[in-house]
Amino acid sequence: MTSNNPNQPVSYPIFTVRWLSVHALAVPTVFFIGAISAMQFIQR
């Protein structure tokens, strides 16, 4: 984060495992929060 080198191959491929783990948790979480909040309005 503090390094200003765009060609830093130390931990650069974060879109392989970290991207999958973040989106595998974030996408269903946003979907379930939207679905649960929608159920709160259609129930009454």
UniProtKB/Swiss-Prot annotation:
The chain crosses the membrane at residues 19-35. Its cofactor is heme b. It is a single-pass membrane protein. One of its GO terms (molecular function) is iron ion binding. PROSITE patterns: CYTOCHROME_B559. Heme binds at residue 23. Its main location: membrane. Belongs to the PsbE/PsbF family. This is Cytochrome b559 subunit beta. It comes from Rippkaea orientalis (strain PCC 8801 / RF-1) (Cyanothece sp. (strain PCC 8801)). The gene is psbF.
